[in-house]
Structures are given as C-alpha cells and as structure tokens.
C-alpha cells in the first residue's frame, strides 16, 4: 500500500477553515508520530484495534458524493451499504464498531452472510443515522487496507524535523532479502540534539535497530555508527522511535541516521519515495542524501543509483 504522510501529518481544527479550500497557513494542533496498517481484510484485527485503540480508517468504493446522492448500493431505510463490484476505492470512512449479527437482508444487494461494521462518514449528520452507517463485512473493499492512528502528540513535541521524503511511503526497495540497511544524511542547525527518528515498517513483525553517525564525512562514515535504539513492531506502518538518550549534534555539521530493518516474508523491506504517477509528480530527488545496503558494508546512493529518496526522518530539540 501507499501511505502518504507529507512532512508529518498535522491535524488542524477544520471548523476554523472550512471543507472546500486548502489553507497553507493551517496551524497544527497535534503531530502524528505513529500509524499502524492492517492489511488483507483481517476483520478480527480491525475489531481488536477498534476496541483497544479507537477508530480505524479504511477505504471503500462509493457511488455517492454527498448525503443527498442517489445510490444503487446504499439503503436509506437501514443506513446500510454493500458494494460487490470491481470499481476501485474512492472514499474513506472510519470504523467505530461492529455487529456480527447485523442481518444481510438489510442491504440493497444481499451479501453471503450477516455481519457489518458501524462506520462514521464525513458528510454530516444528514447522512445515515446522525452520520453513522453500516457496511457489510463482505463489501468489496472494506478493510483491504486499514490505518489506525495510534500516537498523537502535542504540536511542540520537537523543534525541528529533518527529512527528504515529503510525500511519504510511495514504494519499496530491497535486495531480495528480508533484511536491509538504509540511511539518510542531514546537516545540523545550531544548538541541536537528536531526540527521535521515524520510519516505515513495510510489513508485520518488523524488527529494527537505530544507529547514529554524529560526524558524517562520506559513505565510509556509515561504518562508524552507534546503536541508540532497537525494537519490534506488530504491524506495518509509520513509527517514531524516541532515543533513550539524546545525541548532541555539532553545529553546521552533517550527521546520519542508519536503520537496520528485518521484515519477515518480504524481499523489499525499505520504504521509499519516488516519482510513481500523477499523484507523486511533486517528488523532488534533489533534497535528499540517502544510502542503501544489504549488510551495512557496501552502500548505494538512493538518489543516484535508485532515483528515489529514503523514507527516514530525524527529530531534534534545541539545547539552551
């Protein structure tokens, strides 16, 4: 899947700005630091996530554009929706509950079994039951890919973000192996310490090691890396790892963040940004200095050799 988290997802209060315009001066009220991805129509995992973590975002095909639209698949009497066609996804909803016994006879078309998710739409209280409606478990797209936003922090949690992947996870790279190393190089500002790093796990049960190079001269410097964190994540997704002890950065000097990642059952564990299609035509390869390696010894330039940017972010705080 593609998970676009431009810069860092920064929620804002939409009532201040309206729904029909984009305001480049939006003021962030929170920073998203973690999002889990549940794939392959894993309905039980989605239910568990709703129960333990809150609403789960998912995508469907909708033949409606607002609450007043006519629809072949939406039953207004029961506030229920079931699509069994081949059109691709075009609308997001949030799963907030479920009913295993919800009758399949409540839909315009009849699914093979009972059961439905309770979903929150974005079309106001005139739609469905005060904005909520049922979607059959057997809808063509429900839960194909679901996202759980699991870590929101205050907007002042870090002072600066270093990154080259402003479009986020667009594709994957690897060396026909479940493990790989990837790194990004940045130039530090003044009076900064490295507090956290963020990256994508492209599959479940991913283990990681985070290294830092505080004095980067060239790619040979990547061998002088210092282990600063390690762990495992349950699902694919976007994760921020706080360092147990912040690393002081030299003013105006280059530093590197290196990730050693292992993702079972994949040959391409590295998330990258590249020019894939019309949705990513704002891709800028000139803003990054990334490196890729199988075992952390021989390195390739992400930009020169693979025409991509590595999805890896560094967060710093100002030291007084």
What annotation goes with each model-predicted range?
Residues 1-116, 125-203, 231-235, 250-251:
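Predominantly the structural core of cysteine protease catalytic domains
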Residues 60-62, 99, 123, 201, ...:
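Short beta-strand segments enriched in hydrophobic/aromatic residues
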Residues 96, 211-213, 313:
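Conserved hydrophobic/aromatic positions in well-ordered beta-strands
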Residues 150-154, 215, 312-320:
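Short beta-strand-to-coil "C-cap" segments at the C-terminal boundary of structured domains/repeats
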Residues 205-285:
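Aromatic- and Gly/Pro-enriched, solvent-exposed loop/edge beta-strand patches characteristic
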Residues 260-320:
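Short, surface-exposed beta-strand/loop patches at domain edges
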């Amino acid at each position: 899947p593609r998970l676009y988290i431009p810069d860092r997802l920064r929620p804002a209060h939409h009532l201040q700005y309206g729904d029909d315009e984009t305001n480049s001066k939006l003021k962030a009220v929170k920073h998203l630091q973690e999002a889990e991805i549940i794939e392959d129509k894993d309905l039980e995992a989605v239910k568990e996530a709703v129960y333990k973590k809150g609403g789960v975002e998912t995508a469907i095909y909708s033949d409606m554009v607002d609450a007043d639209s006519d629809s072949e698949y939406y039953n207004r009497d029961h506030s229920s929706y079931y699509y069994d066609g081949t059109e691709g996804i075009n609308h997001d909803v949030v799963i907030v509950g479920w009913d295993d016994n919800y009758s399949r006879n409540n839909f315009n078309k009849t699914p093979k079994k009972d059961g439905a998710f309770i979903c929150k739409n974005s079309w106001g209280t005139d739609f469905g039951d005060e904005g909520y409606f049922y979607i059959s478990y057997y809808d063509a797209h429900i839960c194909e890919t679901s996202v759980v936003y699991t870590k929101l922090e205050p907007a002042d949690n870090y002072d600066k973000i270093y990154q080259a992947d402003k479009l986020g996870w667009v594709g994957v790279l690897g060396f026909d192996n479940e493990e790989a190393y990837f790194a990004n190089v940045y130039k530090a500002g003044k009076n900064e310490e490295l507090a956290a790093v963020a990256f994508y796990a492209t599959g479940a049960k991913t283990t990681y090691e985070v290294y830092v190079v505080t004095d980067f001269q060239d790619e040979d410097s990547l061998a002088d890396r210092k282990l600063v964190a390690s762990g495992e994540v349950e699902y694919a997704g976007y994760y921020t790892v706080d360092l147990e002890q912040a690393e002081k950065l030299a003013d105006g000097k280059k530093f590197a963040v290196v990730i050693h990642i292992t993702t079972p059952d994949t040959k391409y564990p590295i998330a990258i940004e590249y020019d894939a299609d019309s949705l990513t035509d704002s891709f800028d390869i000139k803003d990054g200095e990334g490196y890729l390696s199988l075992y952390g010894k021989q390195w390739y330039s992400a930009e020169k050799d693979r025409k991509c940017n590595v999805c890896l972010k560094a967060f710093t705080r100002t030291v007084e």
